[in-house]
Amino acid sequence: MSAVTPALVKELRDRTGLGMMECKKALGDANGDIELAIENLRKVSGLKAAKKEGRTAADGVVAVKVAADNSYGVAVEVNSETDFVARDAGFLAFVNSVVEKAFAAKQTDVAAVMAGELEIAREALVQKIGEKISVRRINLVEGGVVGGYVHLNNRIAVLVQLEGGSEDVAKDVAMHVAAVNPQVVSADQMPADVVEKEKEIIRAQPDMAGKPAEIVEKMIVGRISKFLKEASLVDQPFVKNPEQTVAQFAKAGGATVKSFVRLEVGEGIEVAVVDFAAEVAAQVAASAKS
């Protein structure tokens, strides 16, 4: 049996990021063969990763990459469990690898992007960091002039597609989308069910009580018009110059806004609130069963 030297343990720790005792045991099980130890740890890491999948990964980062000729761009969201991990250099390097592969392939299918080496890298990162890590979504915008913007510590990412215009115009519109969060490009894109729901809310407001039906309907029309302007990108006051709308800003730059994608870390993910005492009790119970 080969000796497990401190130097071997250190090398394995450096290569895997695992603790000293775990590395020492792995080397002992592998008779001092570091490559076999790594192979065995990779097998174990798959099990560890699977055990963490029940947790909620609602933190993380978003990232954007746009082609040099602005013909297309991708936006990616990768989740972790905590913002501490979201700032980890290894995590950010993994995110960059995901972006690069999605960008090169113009691929939005997460499973296809993650197939092969990236999934192995994800599992290794889960093992090293100790948190659930998942690639949640990938968006592609292609055609016309595409601009991108990342805001607020990599927590909001935007891609904007213009017809005409320039990279600078697209970037400025993307910055506006990040800051103001419009629902649609223009009022005609607002889903009918959203408009109907807004009408119901307006009808139920106290100042509508006792008014004639025709007056109520006129007030609803006016308030819906205001709602649509506030929610539609092209009708919003441009964030860098509120004296003009986004449509006017784009037109001055020779552009028309065609579409946008806005990703915000964790949006739509429900995070369960667990009582601390109950969580500890659950962990103790689980340990007793194992």
UniProtKB/Swiss-Prot annotation:
Cited CDD domains: UBA_EF-Ts (cd14275)
Annotated segments matching region Involved in Mg(2+) ion dislocation from EF-Tu: 82-85
MF terms (GO), sorted A to Z: translation elongation factor activity
Keywords per UniProt: Cytoplasm, Elongation factor, Protein biosynthesis
Pfam family, one: EF_TS
Main location per the UniProt record: cytoplasm
Gene3D superfamilies xrefs: 1.10.286.20, DNA helicase RuvA subunit, C-terminal domain, Elongation factor Ts, dimerisation domain
Subcellular location: Cytoplasm
Signal peptide: none
GO cellular component: cytoplasm
Role according to the record: Associates with the EF-Tu.GDP complex and induces the exchange of GDP to GTP. It remains bound to the aminoacyl-tRNA.EF-Tu.GTP complex up to the GTP hydrolysis stage on the ribosome.
Family to which the UniProt record says this protein belongs: Belongs to the EF-Ts family.
HAMAP family linked: EF_Ts
Protein name: Elongation factor Ts
Lineage: Bacteria, Pseudomonadati, Pseudomonadota, Gammaproteobacteria, Cellvibrionales
Gene it is expressed from: tsf
